[in-house]
Amino acid sequence: MSGARRCGDRRSERSSVVGDNRNGYVETDPTGRYGRLSEVLGKGAMKTVYRGFDELRGVEVAWNQATISDVLRTPDALHRMYAEVSLLADLRHDAIIAFHASWVHPSRRTFNFITELFSSGTLRSYRLRYPRVSRRAVAAWARAILRGLAYLHSRGVIHRDLKCDNIFVNGHLGQVKIGDLGLAAVLRGCTSARSVIGTPEFMAPEMYDECYGVGVDVYSFGMCMLEMLTNEYPYSECDNPAQIYKKVTAGKLPDAFYLLTDADARRFIGRCLVDAAHRPSAEELLLDPFLSPPQNHDDHNTIAHATAPPPPLPLACSNSSEEQEEEEAPAAKTTGMAITGKLNKEHDTIFLKVQIGGGGNVRNIYFPFDVANDTAMEVATEMVKELDIADREPTEIAAMIEQEIVRLVPGYKQHEYSYADDDDDDDVNGQPNPFYYLSSSPTSSQGSLCGVGPTSSEGFPGPHGKVDWSRDYCYYPPSSVSVSDDDDSSTSSLSAAVSAISLQQQHCSASSSRLGPASASASEDGGGHAGRPRQREGEEERRRRRMSRNRSMVDMRSQLLHRTLVEELNKRLFFNTVGAVHDIGFRDPTTYGSSSSSSSSQHRRRSSSKVDHKHHYMF
């Protein structure tokens, strides 16, 4: 009985600790051992990491939480979450992040797991926070990372996404551990994996060939060492993954490698970045002299520019010099190309795989395609430029990309507006396209429909900014637009603005040319060229001046709306009730018949402004 009472007392004491919530928990695990606080430590694509507390051991922990809807959204997300939890539960090493518990909360519909907490965040953020670090400290970090890799590889696990962002630090202990095993692969009865996945800057060349082993982690470790020693992200000089792919497969090292002045550090990193056949294992790298404790204790950071660049390392992905010459030579017209894609609905992004070549010489290029912002033509042009594709035109590649996107996203259609194409349509049909905003005729109704006539250049200049729509030039000052002073007619201000712009076209044609304002030479030749047809341009110039039709219409409509609003404000600013009544039926005999309507309007505004000083407070 006494034993039962003691158990009951312990149970009631434990529930009271959780029930009174003196620790400020937001929620607890089913056993009541772990409590989650509201403080967010980090947030990823699928999960959010909160600060938690382990009441049994009295230590803080990392509470990882993901909603079930996000985990089950795609098979890849589910596989990644399951792989991370299952691997962490089976791994026990002082260089691998520790795993404590996992469970599903039915009512909250969340998946939760508890891991070790690292007070200083990732190694990348820690390194940026403290730029000056000795070689001795970096060597200690490297030994811990290599021990963790050796442990993973001994159990047939490839991390596949090793980088400083996935290495965590306890700054008060100088301790680093490997984490984020969501992309890890387990080799079951084989020695190689085939999926292409990871971060391009840290991916080994053989990963693009879809046949690799544990050596890819050693390559990634070399890039981590380069970042730790130079504080520079690998291949930061590249603008996109295509450039990174080109340099990696060509065996070119990042520019940060040439910042190293320490010969031992350069040699050590070079061992990690050679081709897979000559790359050492993690256990072999642990015996390298670079990682042995230094004799002197006053060594400093190795960030410095090298006086002379070291010789390039052996090519990582080629088998012979003949193969290199074949890649550098222009490809034959019969070179095959296949484009396949995979849709990521969470980020509205399609990951495209371009397979170039055939037989034994095949290149695979992977890159994302943003459905909302990218166009097939832009991506195709970039591919031709960055990958040196000489046997195919960008239009041909763009058609293949669009075909794959339409297959993944039914109903997708990218509209493009081309000035050159519209000129061709004019020659064939005899009349402009309904979306043609730059008519070659000064009296064309289509050309002035949206407020941009044939001689309008670069949108609306002046205080409203410019939009480079064409090479035509004409400036319509706000005062030249006639707007009614009656408040009831404010709804027709847009049509009034359009009419005024149409009336100004002939005046602008006499004082400007298609390429800019009229110069002295232009006037000597007989005036402007607004009525002349547009000259034909090369295919490259046409592609350069191509504009998305949707973006063009949005820009023009926004300019028109902005202009109309400004005119309405000007109308109310200069409108004066007393002056308007005073000037009814009045016309200045000195200016009547000789000045334009705009001059008379300005005179009435000056007269009304004089009366406005006397009746200012009537408004």
From Swiss-Prot:
Keywords: ATP-binding, Kinase, Nucleotide-binding, Serine/threonine-protein kinase, Transferase. Residues 1-30, 293-335, 419-464, 508-555, 585-619 are annotated as: Disordered. It is an enzyme of class 2 (transferase). The active site is at D180. GO terms for molecular function: ATP binding; protein serine kinase activity; protein serine/threonine kinase activity. ATP binds at T115, E116, L117, F118, K163. This is Probable serine/threonine-protein kinase WNK8. Signal peptide: none annotated. The keyword Transcription does not apply. Pfam families: Pkinase. It catalyses: L-seryl-[protein] + ATP = O-phospho-L-seryl-[protein] + ADP + H(+); L-threonyl-[protein] + ATP = O-phospho-L-threonyl-[protein] + ADP + H(+).
